[in-house]
């Protein structure tokens, strides 16, 4: 038990979500963490990028000097190789079907890009309360033939059956599915938003990052992401796949 330890215990805080938004406002769920920051012995983030931002946030709060450690929340035991040719124009996304994941944007992106790439297909894996809304959006856009909700599945052997992974989440503290998709050699596409996307997506190497800001209209974000998706599939994908494995 904690109280029976011979040596004094250390108090740490693990940041599981964004702590400071683009507009400079702090995430309210961490209000008391920052109010009593000096009582903590150290903090833990999932990425080096969030560690850097947290250092800046603490400095603005007058709390410099508190150690911060970056510890990834997951890792890959091994890479997952494709057992054959990946189906052309195949895209996957996977997450909890929750409004914060913005799967609706992924649907709009693919629906727009499919007008220029008629063979494009998107499979959406995951379960959640947003499923009915997403199903209705797919019907509204008349995209039932090329966008499908696939439900929950063990994705390890599913990732290699696709050429590209699309994420439209507007912030991820890590991004486990991005890590898994990269480990299966997929080309990656998403917003240049903190923190997981720029950790795993290397611009022009294994995919594309689309500039993101909270002030940019969603219609523009969708168009720019659709343009990049088309550009990706008009490219030789082999170097992108190898860069993800690397």
Residue ranges and their predicted role:
Residues 135-152:
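Nucleotide-activated donor-binding/catalytic signature segment of Leloir-type glycosyltransferases, i.e.
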Residues 89, 93-115, 129-135:
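A conserved mid-protein helix/loop that constitutes part of the nucleotide-sugar donor-binding site
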């Amino acid at each position: 038990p904690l109280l029976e330890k011979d040596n004094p215990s250390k108090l740490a805080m693990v940041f599981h979500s964004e702590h400071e938004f683009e507009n400079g406002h702090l995430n309210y769920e961490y209000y008391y963490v920052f109010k009593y920051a000096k009582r903590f012995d150290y903090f833990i983030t999932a990425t080096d990028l969030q560690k850097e931002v947290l250092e800046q946030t603490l400095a603005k709060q007058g709390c410099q000097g508190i150690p911060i450690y970056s510890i990834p929340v997951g890792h890959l035991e091994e890479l997952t190789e494709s057992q054959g040719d990946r189906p052309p124009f195949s895209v996957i996304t996977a997450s909890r079907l929750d409004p914060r994941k913005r799967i609706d944007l992924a649907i709009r992106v693919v629906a727009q890009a499919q007008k220029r790439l008629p063979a494009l297909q998107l499979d959406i894996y995951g379960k959640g309360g947003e499923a009915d809304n997403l199903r209705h959006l797919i019907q509204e856009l008349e995209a039932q033939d090329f966008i499908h909700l696939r439900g929950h599945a063990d994705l390890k052997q599913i990732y290699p059956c696709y050429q590209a992974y699309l994420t439209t989440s507007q912030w991820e503290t890590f991004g486990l599915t991005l890590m898994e998709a990269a480990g299966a050699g997929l080309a990656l596409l998403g917003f240049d938003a903190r923190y997981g996307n720029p950790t795993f997506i290397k611009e022009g190497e294994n995919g594309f990052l689309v500039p993101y800001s909270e002030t940019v209209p969603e219609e523009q974000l969708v168009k720019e992401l659709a343009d990049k998706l088309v550009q990706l599939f008009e490219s030789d994908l082999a170097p992108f796949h190898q860069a993800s494995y690397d």
